[in-house]
């Protein structure tokens, strides 16, 4: 008992089928469920790829194997060497008759959470016992989709000439001058966890890297306690030289469209497990100007002044009128970050955009201000001290090209794709205002 020995898995559950009739296999996983019917034991073994039925008839297996089968408890870890037997009456058209069963570890009882989902639990209980919650097939399917989405996004970036970079997550000042920072002890200096790779992405444009992307953690000390906010998230960021905001939106559309297309083509099993009928939206996505969006919100009976950001009621009103992905463009300069480039013909508006999905903000982006003097003016206009951005500003003195970019939170993207109402469902171990463990 408990020793793997020289056994190694030959197949995942999904790889076994009735055409393997008579073949000997080794499968490994957890005891998802068990039924003991006198001289017959039915075991459902669960692994990463699904479940498989093992049938142990007393008259066809050794006495030791039958006794081991009967002794299995729920969520015990096991390895089974057995023979595939085609059986039209079996749910999958076959079953596995065990030759030998190894119990690799026993699970304590009672279980604090039921991975078979026969007993429901609220989200706080599930997150407290997340290691058990993550065994649930639906949850595993969601994170398989997440992995494939990130793979698709990386492929799209590489196919379009972007270089993968990693920027510091320990920083000396705020990216956008805000107070939403987590301070940390950094020897004898003041430091913070990075809230965005924005300034470093722009410095890479000055370095001549032309097109870069990064997928990494961001930290924001926002006191939101909603189903849409996290204090630690994974951000997908890109920056591109010699490009305006329209070029940035085009790349963003391509990234989103390719991810949805790849998932639709390659991950129907996971989509079916989650009960999702995935739709791939055609590009280009609709575009509406900020001023038009404000008028639409007011027409819905939600009061909003020009120059304000969209409140939750305003976003909800837009979501009732707009279906799927769409861009909001031409924002007021005063409410966008200091590095956003104003329009030449109307400086009150800037070359910024948000990507929305119904009422949910997915991404913010813009063409950036690449002129040193104008950037310093923008910093001062926001009530910030340019001296706090010395290293960043220096990069603009020696030939910074025009550039644009954006950032997307993978968790919000997965909320859309996996039809989740709570962003915590899309994170292995979420960090929010109340939760620092597990």
From Swiss-Prot:
Keywords per UniProt: Aminoacyl-tRNA synthetase, ATP-binding, Cytoplasm, Ligase, Magnesium, Metal-binding, Nucleotide-binding, Protein biosynthesis
Cofactor: Mg(2+)
Cofactor note as given: Binds 3 Mg(2+) cations per subunit. The strongest magnesium site (Mg1) is bound to the beta- and gamma-phosphates of ATP and four water molecules complete its coordination sphere.
GO cellular component terms given for this protein: aminoacyl-tRNA synthetase multienzyme complex; cytosol
Pfam families: tRNA-synt_2, tRNA_anti-codon
Region (Aspartate): 198-201
Binding site for L-aspartate: 176, 220, 364, 368
Residues the UniProt record annotates as site (Important for tRNA non-discrimination): 91
Residues given in the record as ATP binding sites: 220-222, 228-230, 361, 409-412
GO-annotated biological processes: aspartyl-tRNA aminoacylation
Primary subcellular site in the record, as a coarse category: cytoplasm
GO molecular function, one term: RNA binding
Catalytic activity: tRNA(Asx) + L-aspartate + ATP = L-aspartyl-tRNA(Asx) + AMP + diphosphate
EC number: 6.1.1.23
Residues the record lists as binding Mg(2+) 3: 361
Localization, UniProt: Cytoplasm
Residues annotated to bind Mg(2+) 2: 361, 364
Function: Aspartyl-tRNA synthetase with relaxed tRNA specificity since it is able to aspartylate not only its cognate tRNA(Asp) but also tRNA(Asn). Reaction proceeds in two steps: L-aspartate is first activated by ATP to form Asp-AMP and then transferred to the acceptor end of tRNA(Asp/Asn).
NCBIfam families, sorted: aspS_nondisc, PRK05159.1
HAMAP family associated with the record: Asp_tRNA_synth_type2
Assembly notes: Homodimer.
Protein family: Belongs to the class-II aminoacyl-tRNA synthetase family. Type 2 subfamily.
Protein name: Aspartate--tRNA(Asp/Asn) ligase
Organism the protein comes from: Methanococcus aeolicus (strain ATCC BAA-1280 / DSM 17508 / OCM 812 / Nankai-3)
Taxonomy of the source species: Archaea, Methanobacteriati, Methanobacteriota, Methanomada group, Methanococci
């Amino acid at each position: 008992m408990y020793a793997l020995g020289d056994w190694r898995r030959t197949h995942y559950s999904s790889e076994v089928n009735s055409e393997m009739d008579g073949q000997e296999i080794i499968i490994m996983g957890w005891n998802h469920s068990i039924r003991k019917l006198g001289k017959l034991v039915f075991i459902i073994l669960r692994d990463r790829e699904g479940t498989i039925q093992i049938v142990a008839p007393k008259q066809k297996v050794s006495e030791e194997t039958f006794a081991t089968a009967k002794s299995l408890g729920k969520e015990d870890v096991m390895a089974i060497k057995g023979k595939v037997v085609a059986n039209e009456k079996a749910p999958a058209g076959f079953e596995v008759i065990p030759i030998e069963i190894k119990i690799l570890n026993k699970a304590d009882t009672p279980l604090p959470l039921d991975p078979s989902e026969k007993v429901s639990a609220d989200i706080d209980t599930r997150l407290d016992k997340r290691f058990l919650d993550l065994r649930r097939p639906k949850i595993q399917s969601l994170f398989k989709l997440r992995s494939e989405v990130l793979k698709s996004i990386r492929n799209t970036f590489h196919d379009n000439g972007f270089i993968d970079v990693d920027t510091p997550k320990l920083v000396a000042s705020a990216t956008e001058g805000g107070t939403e920072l987590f301070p940390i002890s950094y020897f004898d200096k003041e430091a913070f966890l990075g809230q965005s790779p924005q300034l470093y992405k722009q410095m890479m444009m000055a370095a001549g890297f032309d097109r870069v992307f990064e997928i990494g953690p961001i930290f924001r000390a926002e006191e939101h306690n909603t189903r849409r906010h996290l204090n630690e998230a994974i951000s997908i960021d890109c920056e591109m030289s010699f490009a305006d905001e329209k070029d940035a939106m085009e790349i963003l559309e391509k990234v989103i469209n390719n991810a949805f297309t790849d998932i639709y083509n390659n991950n129907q099993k996971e989509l079916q497990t989650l009960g999702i009928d995935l739709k791939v939206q055609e590009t280009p996505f609709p575009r509406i100007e900020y001023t038009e969006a404000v008028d639409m919100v007011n027409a819905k009976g939600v009061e909003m002044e020009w120059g304000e950001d969209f409140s939750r009621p305003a976003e909800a009103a837009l979501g009732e009128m707009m279906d799927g992905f769409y861009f909001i463009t031409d924002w007021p300069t005063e409410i966008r970050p200091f590095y956003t480039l104003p329009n030449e013909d109307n400086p009150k508006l800037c070359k910024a955009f948000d990507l929305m999905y119904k009422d949910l903000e997915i991404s913010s982006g813009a063409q950036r201000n690449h002129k040193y003097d104008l950037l310093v003016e923008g910093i001062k206009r926001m009530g910030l001290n340019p001296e706090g951005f010395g290293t960043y500003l220096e990069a603009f003195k020696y030939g910074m090209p025009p550039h644009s970019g954006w950032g997307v939170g993978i968790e919000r993207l997965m909320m859309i794709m996996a039809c989740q109402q709570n962003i915590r469902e899309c994170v292995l171990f979420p960090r929010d205002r109340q939760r620092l463990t597990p």
